[in-house]
Structure formats: C-alpha cells, structure tokens
Amino acid sequence: MIEFGNFYQLIAKNHLSHWLETLPAQIAAWQREQQHGLFKQWSNAVEFLPEMTPWRLDLLHSVTAESETPLSEGQLKRIDTLLRNLMPWRKGPFSLYGVDIDTEWRSDWKWDRVLPHLSDLTGRTILDVGCGSGYHLWRMIGAGAHLAVGIDPTQLFLCQFEAVRKLLGNDQRAHLLPLGIEQLPALKAFDTVFSMGVLYHRRSPLEHLWQLKDQLVNEGELVLETLVIDGDENTVLVPGDRYAQMRNVYFIPSAPALKKWLEKCGFIDVRIADVCVTTTEEQRRTEWMVTESLADFLDPNDRSKTVEGYPAPQRAVLIARKP
C-alpha cells in the first residue's frame, strides 16, 4: 500500500503546512474512487521489492545506486522482474544495483540542457508538474534541492517512483502525489516550479501558466519546457485530430509566442534558454518500453515532418520569474 503520511508529517513543520487543509482529503478520495484496474498489481510489485540502502548513491550525474558487494544472481533477477512488471518505463534512465532501466526517453539529456540555465537549486523547495516517473525529482535533489515535490495523475508513474525510492533507501527528500495541477490550491510556496512536456496537452495554455504562477513564491523561478514550432511571436500551430500520433495536443506556439504568453501572464525576465529538435536517439523504443516511439511518429520519407505532415517535434526551454 502506497502511503502519504510521511509527506504530511514533513510539510506540517514547514511553509507548505497550509496545503494540509485540502491535500489529505484529496488523496483519500483518490484512494477510494480513482484507482486504475492494474494498480493493485503495480503496487504489489513495489511491495515485493527489497528495501535497499545504497552504499554509493549518485544523483548529481545520473540516478545510480550501488551496493558495496555485487548482488547475487537471484537478487538481481528478483529486482529486474519486479521492475519489469511496471513497464512501460518512459522517463529515466535508472541504474539500480546492476539493473539498468533503459527508458524510452533519455531524460538525462533534457536535464543537461536545462540545468545550466537555472538559478542555483541549493536549499530550494521545488514543484515538478507532470513529473512522470520522478526521474527529474531525483536529479533536482542531486543538484542540491531541499525538497522536490512532483505531481502527476498517472498511477503507473506513482508506482515507478515508489519502486525507485524503495531502492534508494526510502529517501524522503522527493515525493510524488497523484494529482493534477488543477487540484492544487494557490500555494505560493515553491522557489522553483518546473513544467516540462505538459503545456501542449492543456486545452487552455494561458490558464496553465497562471496555475504555475500561483505555486511560486514572489521572485520564484519558472522552468517551462514544451513543444514549439518555428515562427514569430504570432505563430501558433493548432493540430487537427493528432500530432505525432498524440490525440491530446492543443496548441504548439513558437518560442517567441510562448515568451509573449508568459509576459502576458505577468512573468518577468523571460528568456528562451534552449531550442532543439527531438531526435530518435533521445526518444526511442527499448526493451523497457516496447511499443511505438518517435521513429514511428515521423514521416518515413521526410523525417522533418510527422506522419500527419506537421513539423517534427522540437522543444524549447524558457525561464521566467514571478515578480
């Protein structure tokens, strides 16, 4: 059973304590009403994993846990099998005592692009919206964050996060809650808020930007990473039924348009930190994610286009500040 009591106790003593007015009731309702048909199977996989305390833990350069002496073949097989019960693994990679989870996305590459542009994370309280398996939460801790909180309603991601946490010595510096941003009150409590790979899934992107702003302290930093297209500040793509085979893609602005949106929502010091084309080396099918991936979503005769004829995915990182 995945519990959230440790998180409640943690925030009861800090500047997030006002979240306890709504959060426990929301989590209780989620536990009663909204569990996925496979959730019991996934949570059992987490429960059956051994509790491990790393002899060496690297969260600065990767998410790697090692034991002082190599695990036995039986121990490795047990961990490997239980982690494979949580497939597909999309965000990573993780290296856990000799079990290497080669995820669909090289999320470490994204982190390497983002990190140089951030304010120092040392001592910061961070929110990661749409955090997936929580890979970047661990990297935030590795970069010095005091507390990293992720929210993502996808229940498989919660189980993946808890599995990794159990193998990292039950580390309580990072937490994942099965919520969407719309379920959060205006906490105004986070020093840095990340939204990576979320904006294009929102029917109202400006509302999403306001929701992110409501989570930041004054002078707090927003890190926004999303799909963009080429163009000026008035260029926005509104795809038809699908974009790169994804149904729920609503608005893909140019980076200059996105900068303008952020300024319209009252952010200051907005800058475009990075723009890059997503490659089939960064997002691909692996033995830990065996279904279709980016290569299947691009026009086989013209890799600069999706199968629907739109510009192929490129992603921008924008940094902004709440006044």
From Swiss-Prot:
Record-annotated membrane-spanning stretches: none
Recorded GO molecular functions are: methyltransferase activity; transferase activity, transferring alkyl or aryl (other than methyl) groups
Q: What is its EC number?
A: 2.5.1.-
Which SUPFAM superfamilies does its entry note?
S-adenosyl-L-methionine-dependent methyltransferases
One Pfam family assigned to this protein is: Methyltransf_9
Residues given in the record as carboxy-S-adenosyl-L-methionine binding sites: K91, W105, K110, G130, D152, P153, T154, I181, E182, M196, Y200, R315
Going by the UniProt record, its keywords in alphabetical order are:
Transferase, tRNA processing
UniProt-listed GO biological process terms: tRNA wobble uridine modification
Q: Which transformation does this protein catalyse, written as a reaction?
A: carboxy-S-adenosyl-L-methionine + 5-hydroxyuridine(34) in tRNA = 5-carboxymethoxyuridine(34) in tRNA + S-adenosyl-L-homocysteine + H(+)
| Classification via HAMAP family | tRNA_carboxymethyltr_CmoB
- How does it associate, per the subunit comment? Homotetramer.
To which protein family does this belong? Answer: Belongs to the class I-like SAM-binding methyltransferase superfamily. CmoB family.
- Task of the protein: Catalyzes carboxymethyl transfer from carboxy-S-adenosyl-L-methionine (Cx-SAM) to 5-hydroxyuridine (ho5U) to form 5-carboxymethoxyuridine (cmo5U) at position 34 in tRNAs.
What protein name applies here?
tRNA U34 carboxymethyltransferase
- Which species does the entry assign this protein to? Salmonella paratyphi B (strain ATCC BAA-1250 / SPB7)
Q: Which gene encodes it?
A: cmoB
